[in-house]
Amino acid sequence: MPAHLRTGIAGEDAAFFELRRKGYTVVARRWSAGTLDGDVDLIAWQGPMLCFIEVKTRTARDRTPAEAAVDRHKQYVLRGLARAYIRHLPQGDPPPTRFDVISVYLVPGEKREFMHFENAFGWN
């Protein structure tokens, strides 16, 4: 497996455990609708709020923060995936939702760092 994929998986794993530590209930990892491009890294409940979470991982610090990689196109893809996921929920009013981004820094020789951006972008 290429190094960048191993790094991404390590970051998603770290974010998963950090969310659980914070009391989230993670219900899906790397969820894909099958027909749409991409996947949602983590889907979790924080109380009544359904959170669609994109994780960006870096092993070095550069000028551009990791969360900046969630550009307009990625946001568009995540919105489509969220709609598909919500359609699979039991009938009734859709739950309140939000889109979060978690930046994970796994820099050798440094303590692991998380930056959690709740409600990083919306439905529009």
Would you name each region that the model predicts?
Residues A15, L36-G38:
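N-terminal polybasic phosphate/anion-binding patch
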Residues P2, G34, T57-P108:
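Catalytic cores of nucleic-acid endonucleases
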Residues V26-A28, F52, F99:
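Hydrophobic residues on conserved beta-strands that form the core of alpha/beta folds
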Residues V104-N124:
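Short, low-complexity, polybasic intrinsically disordered segments
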Residues V40-R63, L78:
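Conserved catalytic cores of phosphodiester-cleaving nucleases, focusing on short active-site segments
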Residues M1-R30:
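Acidic-basic catalytic patches of nuclease active cores, encompassing PD-(D/E)XK
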